[in-house]
Amino acid sequence: MKDRARLGQLLLTGVPGKELDPETAKRFRKLQPGGYILFGRNIESPEQLRKLIDDLRDLSEIEPFITIDQEGGRVSRLRLIGSEPPNAQQLREKADLKLIDEHGRLTGQVLRMFGFNLDLCPVLDLSFDDEADNSLKGRCWGTNPDEVIRNAATFNKAMRREGVLSSGKHFPGYAAAEVDPHHELPVIDKTLEEMEELELRPFRALLPDLDSIMTCHSHYPCWDADRPRWPASLSKNIIGQFLRNQLAYEGLVMTDDLDMGAVLNEVTFEETIEACIEAGNDLAMICHRVELVEKADEVIATLPDPILYDALVRIEKTKKKMASPYPWSIDRFREIDAKIWDLRVKTLGEEQAKILSVEDGKRSPVELY
């Protein structure tokens, strides 16, 4: 059980640059992480990105998750080398499920071309305020549960048909957050009944069709009143008792980025790693402080065997569903990218489509990660 290649499977790590330097390659070869998450800092050109992903796969003894946030709009890492897809709000306001289906299909196709096998979406949070300063602006599929369920399910089904796995986020829902978890810990002071009426409905509806769930960094007194300022991503009550037991979810569960301020400012690194796995997460996500993945691995090695075994089984089961990358073709990439631009024009109109998403300086710069 304490086999190095297996314990590393519980880690989803970022990558420092646009290519694997010798030190990073040595670290990953030794650690054997379960997966890698890429950001704008890793993307320079189509050919470079495919080579980076091929290199990550080549040094892995067990096929890794290769993941990214490719939602649409400002949270579209691939817009650095291609077209920016419309975001969830723009598509929902168009009110055409055929366009959402097309968005899902094209997202799956372009990701598979590069070798990504898991996309960290759909967002299942509701939008209570489209202008809220909580990182969700433009990213939500609806303002009520039924709208989110209808639209997110359409996107999710279409993307998965193309062979790319999905992750519903941000469980159990942080639409009511008044601050951005990238910077500080939101407190969602709602009753469980209120959560069930709104935030939890999309998760309940889509659970059977999601390949994984991402837990969020918000505090919920209705579950953890005895642990003030304890994030949901580390909560046994929310993940172990509610998600695993009450909702009977047996699939893969991962944390959101443990480098966010909502966790960094509240809990030590060692306690964070220990708590997130003991709570019921299978993957601990470390996006930016890549130099700490060895320390995380050491902490994981101290955890009880039954906890590690259950996580490894869920990881292995999910990985069996991963599809292989398409053979690389720059011409095929350009063909898919042209269709993404056409979708943007159909959604926004030709003139509006030319205006790409920008940050207003008040929101979290999630697309720059």
Question: What kind of region is each of these model predictions?
Answer:
Residues L124-S135:
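Short, conserved phosphate-binding/catalytic loop or strand-edge motifs used
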